[in-house]
Amino acid sequence: TANNLLSAIIDNHIFQGNELNIDPAKITHERCMDLNDRSLRNLKINGVDVHFNISTASEMMAILCLSKNENDLKTRLGNILVGYTYEEKEVFARDLQCVNALFLLLKDALKPNMVKTLENNLALVHGGPFANIAHGTNSIISTNYGLHHFDYTIVEAGFGSDMGALKFFDIVVR
């Protein structure tokens, strides 16, 4: 929802006069959905190429899972590069003054989910961006929670040892 809100804000900004002078052909932020429909990956809307991703492959999912707290989440949301102006200047989400709206949609999602396994053990399930676009594990918050409150914390790193383990050691463990 937050990802597509940002897409709608970009579109509306351009429609309402484009004060930031965003070039519609140079929008880098991609729309997303939870259905892997290959026909929606590359579209042309109003003469502009538009791309859809699945949620787990979105920058928004990576940001949610890499954020350490609410302030970190806000900072990362503001740093989303949404595109470029006709003059090749970068435009960030913070330039559209929408960070608080995005944050309000994501603040509860920042909290890990506690579930019970079939063996009656507690498990934290939270996030999971793909390793080809992000760190490929659950959220940093849930890992840190597990490390501070339990005897054992198990983290699954996606995409095998060549990518998943490398990103786990380079990004998550730090």
Describe the residue ranges of each PLM region.
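Flexible phosphate-sensing "switch/lid" loops adjacent to ATP/NTP-binding sites
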Residues: 1-174
